Amino acid sequence: MYYKCELLVDGYSYQVTDNLVNWDDITTSFKRGDYDGVVRSFSTKFEFSNAAYSLLKRVFREKYLQASASVVFYTRNNSWLWNERFRCSLDFSTFQDNGSTISISAVDDSLAALIKAKKGTQYEYVVSELTEGKYLYYDGIEMNQNVNWLVAGNSIEDSTDVSVEIQAALKSKYFPLAVKSSETSIGGYITYGDTFQQNVSDGGKDTFLFRAERNITCFLSVSISFNVPANKALSMTLVKIGADGNEAELTRTVINDEHPETIFILSYMKDITLLEGDYCFIRYGSAYNMTLTIRDPYISLNWDARIIPVNIDIVTPVKLLNRLLQSINGGQEGITGEIASGVDKRLDECMIVPAESARGLKNAKLYCSYTKFVDWMNAEFGFVPVIGEDKVTFVHRNSLFSKNVVKDFGDNIRSFEYNVNSALIYSRVRAGYDKQDYDSVNGRDEFHFTNEYTTGVTLTENTLELISPFRADAYGIEFLVQKRGEDTTDSDSDNDVFFVNAKLVSIDGRYRLVRTINGGPSISGVISPDTMFNAVYSPRYMIEANRRFIGAFTNMLDFASSDGNSDVVIDGVPEKIDIQLSEGERLFTVGELSVESGDMKAPEDLTGLISIEKGGETYYGYIKDGKFNYGRAEAVKYTLIVESIK
């Protein structure tokens, strides 16, 4: 007998080989679902007669829905010893009895089946239970801040000009200016306000256009063109008052009382260095009543600001993976997750930042599903899961397609059929992250959005989506941190999961963002290259992580567009560069080969190549799926992903 079947009931083993009715339906399959690891599965329905029929019927009658039994299937090896092929529990909720045969299904309690059933479930975790005491020292991005003022005058009909009434006075007065717009998300640098026409001597230290709250250098732009009536004298001065009360005139325009009607300009466009407490305003003085016509005024102050550093709770990818697997397993231990290290430095130096942790919310939570984790690992790093009996290991896809020939069928095959898998042919590739909308103009600097490429292939309209569900946008994290202290929630981003490129620093046990200064790549084309982070998670790096897979269907990716800042250059390589893929890098081709073989032994190494000879050519391919019938000597059916034809 080639196979053997046993029933396990109440700790006893019963030989039921002769009682298995559908013996020729007993199969084991190998399947590579999404160009990742090969998963084994087995038959899920059994039919029993005679002694096995009586045994199962008795168990069901005695224990009803608490009935329990398992089936074990063996095959004989070349040494005439029995090898267990699989075992599974029987599901008595599928119990069927026709009077002579009992039909009952197996409970597919394999890890692969468990993950398949729960992979889309989003779980909620308290971040403090995942951090393992790890913190990110977040010192922010240097951001551009600005304030713009307008002249607080009277509008002139059918004109963009404004008029200002000047009253004769012995004392100087503030020139009337009001805040028009501002971009000041980071406080503690500049306080700004309006000035209205009153005596400067009455205003004191609390009346100013802007005041420095710390030592700082800003860029001040002042350009006020004004039409002064003939023979009217006027002086206008941009003034800086020091914290010690000393006055400095930055620029001054003086018009005497002997001139025709003329346009004059008060202009200042320079860096201005301020000490804490210094403040500025514009004043005027005149002994005449007059009406000034102001044309195209521009008053603006720009400076760079950075948040006060904060600590953010962070989570390692492997910790999140294991917590997801525990949830999938009903909260029980017993399933472990591993992530291969030493393959991609970007992954080795990757830490997860829950949005609520960035916000600094009390009892911050992380929201994630197994599917999102898998999609992130695949799109960002080219890593895919290999599911075993009680362990899930994430490895780079390339490692699952070995160049070693593990089985040579020669020409001992039949039912040969080669075809092109059109589902693997893409005309476009989209890589990156979902576009985010920010309230700040600084957000225009962000480049962690979606890049789109064309492949030059017009045979299909398929699009390969390498879109990460986790976010890497530096400004997204920055704006969340800036919201610390706010009680309101942000439904648009509080449930998001971010990740950062960070290194552990031994001096204080905290993680630091990787930037150019501490080993990160050089970057240009952004507002602050020195403080920008996550450069290695740009969409182009995602393409590089998956380049051998992409090479299956194209040799060139032509950059088409970007949702974000495409002027970024990282380590001297423009983000919008076209990407060349050589034929030698190709992981496999779009061809598939279906064959049958009388060789009943499955390859030991499911990552290696199977070779087949046909018509004077040798085909090399990887297992996509294989079906083995252990109940009878039937040819094994293979579908191979063709690697090459020689």
Residue ranges of predicted features:
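Charged- and aromatic-enriched interaction segments used to assemble
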Residues: 77, 112-176, 220, 302-407
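Short beta-strand-plus-loop segments that form exposed binding edges in beta-rich domains
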Residues: 282-289
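Edge beta-strands of jelly-roll/beta-sandwich modules across compartments, strongly enriched
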Residues: 289-297
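Juxtamembrane "anchor/assembly" segments of surface/extracellular structural proteins
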Residues: 1-86, 91-276, 291, 402-403, ...
